Curated annotation (Swiss-Prot):
GO terms for biological process: deadenylation-dependent decapping of nuclear-transcribed mRNA; mRNA processing; mRNA transport; negative regulation of translation; P-body assembly; stress granule assembly. ATP-dependent RNA helicase involved in mRNA turnover, and more specifically in mRNA decapping. Is involved in G1/S DNA-damage checkpoint recovery, probably through the regulation of the translational status of a subset of mRNAs. May also have a role in translation and mRNA nuclear export. Residues 16-38, 437-485 are annotated as: Disordered. The keyword Amino-acid biosynthesis does not apply. A motif (Q motif) lies at residues 44-72. It is found in: Cytoplasm, P-body. Belongs to the DEAD box helicase family. DDX6/DHH1 subfamily. The keyword Cytoplasm applies. This is Putative ATP-dependent RNA helicase ste13. It comes from Schizosaccharomyces pombe (strain 972 / ATCC 24843). Residues 255-415 form the Helicase C-terminal domain. A motif (DEAD box) lies at residues 193-196. It holds the Pfam family DEAD. The gene is ste13.
Length: 485
């Protein structure tokens, strides 16, 4: 009798689950092969965590199929309220690992701030807040993003309304808390993404001060790919018997193929031009070590005839936001940037990362190459090495326990390109510059290409801070999709 009743209940739950799944507008299934970085799980499902139906609907409609290893380890512990120290590779689903339990624990009947998600950069704050809104779109959860570079008055006005989750950067959040505008007295969930950066000497005093505004029974969760000694010091001082998760059996992503090329400084642009003509690039990010070199390289790339945006920390925040938004939406194939975008930025269409300037340390290298090969997919990382970089190359290989191979005469496209057939992955627009401009103007946005002005020869418009280049005598061309030899 008991067994029969149990069977009926299981069948009822299964039918109920399938019925609500059938009502959703789910994303097409991602057919690209994935590595063990995201597939090596115990086989649990999101339904096994007994999440609210509205949250499950948001998860499945966003295209999530089943938990990745970091989500599988983190979600049940976070739901229990225990402090967490989680270490996992870039691009394996860390953001959803803390966003899902944060959304689940929100009580929408209360008008108080219940979760703070702290991140080190403004771009990452915008991206994380969007994940919160996407997954929680059926839950009536109010999410607010606050960062430096925006008007403090606007944040104060928004905090007069109900806010359940705040996503922000340390300085601005502390400013709001210090002014008594943001009330964290009932905020029991404190999440730090890219915790190693947030606990660096420049941010640690701010974090320490910010914690004084939280209740004693708060839950603190730290997520990152790397944890230096300073994180342990913070953990010993502020975390209560944290549950430690370490999924870093190796530091680099399995799906990212790494090469280096010995190149004289004077030949770097020529080498980059060769790569653009040979590689099958969906979208690429090119890293430089200084903001000045970012703009100079973006100009050179445009003069070669390739579409290019640039972004760095000295640009106005509104321009940085526009560049990031347009690049993410595929308006342009190539983005030149400083280390501003090394952390957490998730653009699924990026399959090639190029270190035009080789990074000085292993941590920066790890975060840079992690912009490709997101969520177990394939990617390619190529580093230009000068004679002065050879010692850094050897040291980074030793610290990461990986071997960066010399670049071969030809690169097998299967290492970083999915032979998609009829399946469509996010790809950059192939429209002409005029069509892109028309589409942007229809949305009330200012275009980057063919904007009338007196600048010539690829010089930046608007004083150099717009983040895009044009040429006076020819249209920017989309390349990078040519077949490799």
């Amino acid at each position: 009798m008991a067994e029969s009743l149990i069977q009926k209940l299981e069948n009822a739950n299964l039918n109920d689950r399938e019925s609500f799944k059938g009502q959703m507008k789910a994303q097409p299934v991602d057919m690209r092969p994935k590595t063990e970085d995201v597939t090596k799980t115990r086989g649990t499902e999101f339904e096994d965590y007994y999440l609210k139906r509205e949250l499950l609907m948001g998860i499945f409609e966003a295209g999530f199929e089943r938990p990745s290893p970091i989500q599988e380890e983190s979600i049940p512990i976070a739901l229990s309220g225990r402090d967490i120290l989680a270490r996992a590779k870039n691009g394996t689903g860390k953001t959803a690992a803390f966003v899902i339990p944060s959304l689940e624990k929100v009580d929408t009947k209360k008008s108080k701030i219940q979760t703070l998600i702290l991140v080190p950069t403004r771009e990452l704050a915008l991206q994380t807040s969007q994940v919160c809104k996407t997954l929680g779109k059926h839950m009536n959860v109010k999410v607010m993003v606050t960062t430096g570079g925006t008007t403090l008055r606007d944040d104060i006005i928004r905090l007069n309304d109900t806010v359940h989750i705040v996503v922000g950067t340390p300085g601005r959040v502390l400013d709001l808390a210090g002014k008594g505008v943001a009330d964290f007295s009932e905020c029991t969930t404190f999440v730090m993404d890219e915790a190693d950066k947030l606990l660096s000497p420049e941010f640690t005093p701010i974090i320490e001060q910010l914690l004084s505004y939280f209740p004693k029974n708060r839950q603190i969760s730290l997520y990152s790919a790397t944890f230096p000694l300073i994180v342990k010091n913070f953990m010993d001082k502020h975390l209560n018997k944290p549950y430690e998760i370490n999924l870093m059996d190796e530091l680099t992503l399995r799906g990212v193929t790494q090469y280096y090329a010995f190149v004289d400084e004077s030949q770097k642009v020529h080498c980059l031009n060769t790569l653009f003509s040979k590689l099958q690039i969906n979208q690429s990010i090119i890293f430089c070590n200084s903001t000045n070199r970012v703009e100079l390289l973006a100009k050179k790339i445009t003069e070669l005839g390739y579409s290019c945006f640039y972004s760095h920390a000295k640009m106005l925040q509104s321009h940085r936001n526009r560049v990031f938004h347009n690049f993410r939406n595929g308006v342009c194939r190539n983005l030149v940037c400083s280390d501003l975008l090394t952390r957490g930025i998730d653009i699924q269409a990026v399959n090639v990362v190029i270190n035009f300037d080789f990074p000085k340390n292993a941590e920066t290298y790890l975060h840079r190459i992690g912009r490709s090969g997101r969520f177990g997919h394939r990617g390619l990382a190529i580093s230009f090495i000068s004679w002065a970089d050879r010692f850094n190359l050897y040291r980074i290989e030793n610290e990461l326990g990986t071997e960066i191979q010399p670049i071969p005469p030809s690169i097998d496209p299967s290492l970083y390109v999915f032979p998609n057939g009829d399946y469509q992955i996010p790809r950059p627009l192939t429209a002409s510059a005029d069509q892109v401009l028309a589409a942007q103007q229809a949305k009330g946005q200012e275009g980057y290409h063919n904007r009338p002005n007196n600048n010539r020869g690829g010089h930046p418009r608007g004083g150099g801070n717009r983040g895009g280049y044009r040429q006076s005598n020819r249209q920017p061309r989309y390349r990078g999709q040519q077949k490799a030899d």
